[in-house]
Amino acid sequence: MTNSTAEKQQPLTLDISKEALADINDMLEKTTAQQRVAWALNNLPDTHIVSSSFGAQSAVMLHMLTQVQPDIPVVLTDTGYLFPETYKFIDELVEKLNLNLHVYRADMSSAWQEARFGRLWEQGVEGIEKYNKLNKVEPMQRALRELNAGTWFAGLRRSQSDTRGKLPVLQKVGQQFKLYPIIDWSNKDLHYYLKDNELSYHPLWEQGYVSIGDWHTTQSLQEGMSEQDTRFFGLKRECGLHEFGDGI
């Protein structure tokens, strides 16, 4: 990356052409994750936020972002059904990294949802999609609005699933630019980053959980399974936050 790309620029606007966006992605493909973050902070519009599931290797993105912008808002959409280990992991990372955590939840409590709709996650793809919209998509949309987010950092990686395999580094999604600094990282890359920076995996990693969401729709990795098979009974990979064309 040249010095000019790291200097503070007039932020990009959402009316950028597809051709110009493609050129930027060509440039970003040739840079490191840390250089992508630096470029984004200098070239993409405020407010910058990062979303986190506080999953298996989430400490990587949280550490990388807070090293250069310590007070960056960290958005968690809490369904009320995270593993107990996840809630403890959140507390640990908030303390260790001094995170500026913003927790968003559905307007309707999890108990009320079950009373009204039953266990949506047991009602096939349609039920799962409704559950995700209530508990993840709508709270995240609210976070983006209330935090006036112009740029959204997320830790998606191409190796995680078929649906993520062709993602660019930078996208326009809804009213935000969305940047994936570690899009081309492998599990080995993540391992060494965690080790080099004295960061921990999620506690359930050692029990074979490679993708960690709600306890009722997350399985440990078994022989013959891919990472994407461990979520939502293999029916879906995406929870809705990172699906494209749904306005978020």
UniProtKB/Swiss-Prot annotation:
This is Phosphoadenosine 5'-phosphosulfate reductase. Belongs to the PAPS reductase family. CysH subfamily. It comes from the Bacteria. PANTHER family: PHOSPHOADENOSINE PHOSPHOSULFATE REDUCTASE. Its EC number is 1.8.4.8. The active site is at 239 (nucleophile). It catalyses: [thioredoxin]-disulfide + sulfite + adenosine 3',5'-bisphosphate + 2 H(+) = [thioredoxin]-dithiol + 3'-phosphoadenylyl sulfate. It holds the Pfam family PAPS_reduct. One of its GO terms (cellular component) is cytoplasm. One of its GO terms (biological process) is hydrogen sulfide biosynthetic process. InterPro entries: PAPS/APS_Rdtase, PAPS_reduct_dom, PAPS_reductase_CysH, Rossmann-like_a/b/a_fold. Its main location: cytoplasm. Catalyzes the formation of sulfite from phosphoadenosine 5'-phosphosulfate (PAPS) using thioredoxin as an electron donor. It is found in: Cytoplasm. It is an enzyme of class 1 (oxidoreductase). Pathway: Sulfur metabolism; hydrogen sulfide biosynthesis; sulfite from sulfate: step 3/3. Keywords: Cytoplasm, Oxidoreductase. CDD domains: PAPS_reductase (cd23945).
